C-alpha cells in the first residue's frame, strides 16, 4: 500500500499560530481553533434544528468546521488585514486556498478521496453549511478577543469591534441564541463559572 502524508500534514496545524501580528496573552494555534469552531458550529446547527425549525446535519457541520482551515497547513495563516487588503489580494488568496485544498485531497488514498474531498473543498459545502461554519468561525474569533481583553490585553479591542460588525452581518436566530445563552460566561472567572456545579 502507498503511504499517505495527509494526517502527518494535518498534525502540523498545531504548529501554526493564529493572530500572528498581535501580542497574545495565550497563543492559539489552528488545530485548537478548528476544534472550537467544530464544537460551536455543531451547537449552532443543533440550535437551528431544535429551536428554529432547521433541518441540517449537525454532525456534518461539525466535520466541515473541523477541516475548515486545513489548507492553512500548506498556506499558513495569513493575517486578516493582509488577506483582505484589497479585492485582488482576497481573490488571489482564495485561488491559493483552492489549490492547497486540492493538494490535500490528492494526498488522501484514492479509495478514500470521495469521503475527504467534500470536507476539505469548501466549494462542496451548501450555502447553509458554509453560513453556519462562517458564523462559528467568527464567533470563535470573537471569543478569543473576549478572553484576551479579560486578561488585560487591549491589543484585541479593535479586533473585537471588527468582529462585532462581522457577527452582525452574519446574524441569525441560532447565533442570537448562542450569544445570549453561552457567551456571557466568557466574561466570568473560573470560580464564577464553577459555583453552580462544584465537584
From Swiss-Prot:
SMART domains: HDc. PROSITE patterns: HD. Keywords: Cytoplasm, Hydrolase, Metal-binding, Nucleotide-binding. It is found in: Cytoplasm. It comes from the Bacteria. It holds the Pfam family YfbR-like. It catalyses: a 2'-deoxyribonucleoside 5'-phosphate + H2O = a 2'-deoxyribonucleoside + phosphate. InterPro entries: HD/PDEase_dom, HD_domain, YfbR, YfbR/HDDC2. GO terms for molecular function: 5'-deoxynucleotidase activity; metal ion binding; nucleotide binding. Its EC number is 3.1.3.89. It is an enzyme of class 3 (hydrolase). CDD domains: HDc. One of its GO terms (cellular component) is cytoplasm. The record marks 18 as: Appears to be important in orienting the phosphate for catalysis. The keyword Cytoplasm applies. Its cofactor is a divalent metal cation. Residues 30-142 form the HD domain. A divalent metal cation binds at residues 33, 68-69, 137. Substrate binds at residues 18-19, 33, 69, 77-80, 137. Belongs to the 5DNU family. Catalyzes the strictly specific dephosphorylation of 2'-deoxyribonucleoside 5'-monophosphates. Homodimer. This is 5'-deoxynucleotidase YfbR.
Amino acid at each position: 500500500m502507498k503511504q499517505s502524508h495527509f494526517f502527518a500534514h494535518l498534525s502540523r496545524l498545531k504548529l501554526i499560530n493564529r493572530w500572528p501580528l498581535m501580542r497574545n496573552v495565550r497563543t492559539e494555534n489552528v488545530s485548537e481553533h478548528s476544534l472550537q469552531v467544530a464544537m460551536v458550529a455543531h451547537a449552532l446547527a443543533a440550535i437551528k434544528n431544535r429551536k428554529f425549525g432547521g433541518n441540517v446535519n449537525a454532525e456534518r457541520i461539525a466535520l466541515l468546521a473541523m477541516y475548515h482551515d486545513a489548507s492553512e497547513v500548506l498556506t499558513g495563516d495569513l493575517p486578516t488585514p493582509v488577506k483582505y487588503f484589497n479585492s485582488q489580494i482576497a481573490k488571489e488568496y482564495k485561488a491559493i486556498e483552492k489549490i492547497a485544498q486540492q493538494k490535500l485531497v490528492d494526498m488522501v488514498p484514492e479509495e478514500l478521496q470521495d469521503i475527504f474531498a467534500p470536507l476539505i473543498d469548501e466549494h462542496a459545502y451548501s450555502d447553509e453549511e458554509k453560513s453556519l461554519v462562517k458564523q462559528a468561525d467568527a464567533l470563535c474569533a470573537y471569543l478569543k478577543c473576549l478572553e484576551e481583553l479579560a486578561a488585560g490585553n487591549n491589543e484585541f479591542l479593535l479586533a473585537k469591534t471588527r468582529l462585532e460588525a462581522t457577527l452582525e452581518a452574519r446574524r441569525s436566530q441560532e447565533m442570537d441564541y448562542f450569544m445570549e445563552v453561552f457567551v456571557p460566561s466568557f466574561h466570568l472567572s473560573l470560580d464564577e463559572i464553577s459555583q453552580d456545579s462544584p465537584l
